[in-house]
Amino acid sequence: MVEALLEIHDMQDTDPDADRLGVMVRNSTGGFTALSGNQVGALITDFLFRKRKASGRFSPQDYVVETLVTTPLTREIAVHHGARCFYELLVGFKYIAQTMEEQGTEHFVFGTEESIGFLAGSYCRDKDASVAALYVL
């Protein structure tokens, strides 16, 4: 069992209704460090844009959405990839969902809040830790 634990590179956990995702990664001392919602959101944002570009599905109309308490790094990643970012929204995923409705879902890539809430896809209008966890793997 100890050997198996030593090989773990990251740990993930959700709250009971699986709408928030916590992530810990192995650090240089062999322990684990918790990532903030901002860090996880930035990593997923970059990953999704890279995958879209690699598969030929990227469009400059693609966009991510973040609320005003979320790091500006998400916006910088979107700009770096040549995409759009809607930011400075009021706190709450209902405002991310509202932006999806206003902008259309065809080019929606990702919604994120610093409170470890993520949505990767347009299949729903609320946080989904299950799909976000797959992207962290």
Per-region residue spans from a language model:
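Phosphate-binding chemistry for phosphorylated carbohydrates and sugar-nucleotides
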Residues: M1-L137
